[in-house]
Amino acid sequence: MQKLLLIAIAGGLGSLSRYSLAGAVQRLFGASFPAGTFVVNITGCFLFGLVWGFLEDRLTLGPAARMIALTGFMGAFTTFSTFIFESVALLNSSQWLFAALNITGQIVLGILLLAAGLYLGKLV
């Protein structure tokens, strides 16, 4: 139960960080390009790798600490970093087909299903 509470707290902090960073960046760049989301996603990828590497190589806090930091904070900050991490893991293990399916599938299906949801949402 304590681990779940810590993940929830880390998730709340990740959400607030995402909101704050995306909003600040978007105000700087204006509304013509989704710069806030762009910066959050690429920053999230860097931070995910940094935190993962730090927890793996520098601290031996165990899987619970990784779960709190990566699933809690980073999961709420951006799921894009998880998508990239899982894709790189597939590539690193030479699972080319699964990597290609993961990358193209999530992007193409994500666009198609968002469009379908938008269409259906307007019908209701």
UniProtKB/Swiss-Prot annotation:
TM region(s), chain numbering: 5-25, 35-55, 68-88, 96-116
Subcellular location: Cell inner membrane
Annotated protein name in UniProt: Fluoride-specific ion channel FluC
Any Pfam family the entry gives: CRCB
Similarity field: Belongs to the fluoride channel Fluc/FEX (TC 1.A.43) family.
Membrane topology of this protein: Multi-pass membrane protein
A biological process from GO: cellular detoxification of fluoride
Stated role: Fluoride-specific ion channel. Important for reducing fluoride concentration in the cell, thus reducing its toxicity.
Upper taxonomic lineage: Bacteria, Pseudomonadati, Thermodesulfobacteriota, Desulfovibrionia, Desulfovibrionales
Binding site for Na(+): 75, 78
